Amino acid sequence: AYEEIMNFNNQISHEKFLRSYSQINPNQEYFNEIISLNKSLMQMRAGRPLPIVMLENNVGQIMTSNKAFMGQKTVLYFWSQTQMNHFKRNEERAKVYKEKFPNYRFVGISIQPYNQLVRNYQEIMNIEIKDQLALVNYQTTTSDWVINLLNKGIILDKNCLILEGFGNFGYEKSFESLLRKHKKIN
């Protein structure tokens, strides 16, 4: 059921699937998880406000996501402290995207809270720390923002409205076309 919900592209199909699934599924707890996922997917659709979560900056200050991203078109991409090669590749991608799309702010988000090792690594690699944040609550944020892959990319307008909630930051051609598509929007 999880994969079906994640792969459907329109609400009518979701609702039809959920009605059928509710009739054959004997496990109410699992059904509730699927309903919750569907709700999160609907919240991440284009035109909706980005669900507000708590984030942490490099020095441990906690802030809300809307405060962190308000005022400029923003691209969110994700990384894990356990996969530093992935982080390095994403930083290289972000640098290329920044050159092509300077009207966007590119923000890397660690799915784990910051630690000193990451701070040191970012300093050695000359990474702009003002554009690096970390999740405060992994469980809540990955559920609210439907972060099921580290290559996920989210594009926001300057008012934290979602322009693209399910981009693939790691697939350059596809993601560049999304950035181009939303280039003229606030």
Region roles according to the model:
Residues 122-158:
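Short, internal strand/loop/helix patches
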Residues 63-94:
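Short active-site neighborhood of thiol/selenol oxidoreductases, capturing the structured segment around
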Residues 155-186:
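Thiol-/selenol-based redox modules, centered on thioredoxin-like
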Residues 70-73, 102-105, 129, 158:
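Loop/turn elements at helix/coil->beta-strand transitions in domains of secreted/extracellular proteins
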Residues 47, 69-70, 100-102, 145-149, ...:
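A structural signal for short secondary-structure junctions
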Residues 1-62:
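Oxidative protein folding and maturation machinery
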Residues 85-125, 137-143:
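Structural microenvironment flanking redox-active thiols in thiol-disulfide oxidoreductases
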